[in-house]
From Swiss-Prot:
It comes from Dinoroseobacter shibae (strain DSM 16493 / NCIMB 14021 / DFL 12). Methylated by PrmB. Part of the 50S ribosomal subunit. Forms a cluster with proteins L14 and L19. GO terms for molecular function: rRNA binding; structural constituent of ribosome. One of the primary rRNA binding proteins, it binds directly near the 3'-end of the 23S rRNA, where it nucleates assembly of the 50S subunit. SUPFAM superfamilies: Translation proteins. One of its GO terms (cellular component) is cytosolic large ribosomal subunit. GO terms for biological process: translation. NCBIfam families: L3_bact. The lineage of its organism: Bacteria, Pseudomonadati, Pseudomonadota, Alphaproteobacteria, Rhodobacterales. InterPro entries: Ribosomal_uL3, Ribosomal_uL3_bac/org-type, Transl_B-barrel_sf. This is Large ribosomal subunit protein uL3. Transmembrane segments: none annotated.
Amino acid sequence: MRSGVIAKKVGMTRLFMEDGKQVPVTVLQLDKLQVVAQRTAEKDGYSAVQLGAGTAKAKRTTKAMRGHFAAASVEPKRKVAEFRVAPENLINVGEEITADHYFEGQYVDVSGTSIGKGFAGAMKRHNFGGLRASHGVSISHRSHGSTGQCQDPGKVFKGKKMAGHMGAARVTTQNLQVVRTDADRGLIMIKGAVPGSKGGWVTIKDAVKKPVPENVILPAALKSAAEEAKRLAEEAAAAAEAEAKAAEEAAAAEAAAAEEAALKQAEAQIEAEKKEGDE
């Protein structure tokens, strides 16, 4: 089990695939997602990483949280969340996670706070059919109807589907597919809709009802590792370029030496022929 990520919902758009099909996607952005703290079994009784996303003003952050972020040597964060991980998948404090944490085709579970609808009736809240439009029904066309029984039990059971507050609740949508990622801009594009409004925070985890892919990055796709790989690649490219340049210079020097030797040989041959003519 590895860490999930915190992302901001940017909005929805569509992508055109190579076969011409268009896929509706939700764009999620990773905004300076860093590890703020660790939870270990020895100290806390469980293994987890605490992540922080976004940047908050210091004056809008409590003194306790300012101290918490200062201990991790990170900027104050707007959103903080914990993710349970296996002990071997703990991430060092201060590390930044990139959008390459997920790959195209992978299935994920996305959790967020749904858009609040206020007080809603049973037809909107629970998809009830409502009462008859006529034939004796007046005023109560969108009513949910009877809610109880007779004198026994003489009450409304808990959990009865009735009118009430709708939305603004924690919702998880499972088995959503990642269509595309953009590590440079920190974007993850997921097929379909995810809970929440534009600008809201969501959490993304590996799908629990799908097998874990073999090619996932453990413990996470870290910016430091990507920068190190990029640096090594640049050094290897520079070394290869220098080696090619040295080989080219050596070949040019060898060709120049061969040309000079051929010129000297030609001059010597001309001198020899001239001497033979004088004799």
